Regions:
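Short basic/aromatic active-site micro-motif
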Residues: 29-33, 103-107, 120-139, 148
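Catalytic-site neighborhood detector that most strongly recognizes the C-terminal catalytic loop/helix
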Residues: 6, 65-72, 150-175
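Active-site/catalytic core of tyrosine-dependent DNA strand-transfer enzymes
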Residues: 10-13, 79-120
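Basic, Lys/Arg- and aromatic-enriched nucleic-acid-binding interface segment
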Residues: 1-46, 50, 128, 139
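C-terminal secondary-structure termini that scaffold catalytic or DNA-interacting sites
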Residues: 70, 94-96, 156, 171-191
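Conserved tyrosine-mediated DNA breakage-rejoining catalytic core shared by Y-recombinases
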Residues: 9-14, 18, 42, 51-90
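Short, polar N-cap/turn motifs at the start of nucleic acid-interacting alpha helices
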Residues: 55-61, 121, 140-162, 185-191
């Protein structure tokens, strides 16, 4: 059974408020909160972010040599909007960890956040569905371009005939981040 679950606008606000409240109360949650925020803002897969190292980070994007859809030896570019970059920059003092986000899975925090926000059926992977939904519906980004940002290989045949410039991906990821952040005040940690 395929699930089609993404957060509602009201759930989005509650999730951000709860993440920021918890971070303010307990700074040891910085890596877990940051992981969830980059999932929300980038549309990346959890496994991609968990494995991303500081060497993979190139400012505007993370480039992975090994990733889920690597069947032809091509790297996967995860484009980062200004919101994602701010979150990652907040972790730069933590470079003693090999991976950017410093943890493999923020599941424990996520499970308690989604319960507190009364959206207990919302999985971490559903944040990726939310990204795609916002991209297509609110930010008016074409399906092919959303697929490119999310690393979907099912559009590979279309990509042979249509090419998306880096500039377009950079603009699109910024639009999505701004749309996700509408109505949300970031704490100073991420500004």
């Amino acid at each position: 059974v395929k699930r089609e679950r993404f957060y509602s606008p009201d759930e989005k606000i509650l999730i951000f408020q709860e993440l920021f409240r918890r971070l303010e109360e307990d700074n040891s949650l910085l890596h877990s909160v940051s992981f969830i925020l980059v999932l929300i803002f980038s549309g990346a897969r959890k496994s991609e972010l968990a494995s991303a190292t500081w060497d993979d980070w190139h400012g505007d994007y993370i480039e992975l040599k090994e990733h889920k859809t690597d069947k032809d030896g091509k790297t996967r570019k995860i484009w980062l909007n200004s919101q994602s970059r701010s979150v990652i920059q907040a972790l730069q003092g933590e470079k003693k960890k090999k991976t950017i986000l410093g943890i493999k899975n923020p599941k424990r925090l996520w499970n308690s956040v989604k319960l507190a926000c009364n959206c207990k059926d919302l999985r971490l992977h559903d944040l990726r569905h939310s990204f795609g939904t916002i991209s297509t519906n609110a930010a008016n980004i074409q399906t092919l371009q959303t697929g490119e940002l999310m690393g979907h290989k099912s559009l590979a045949i279309m990509q042979r005939y249509q090419h998306i410039e880096d500039k377009t991906s950079k603009e699109n990821i910024e639009k999505i981040g701004n749309e996700i952040l509408s109505g949300i005040d970031l704490p100073t940690t991420y500004q």
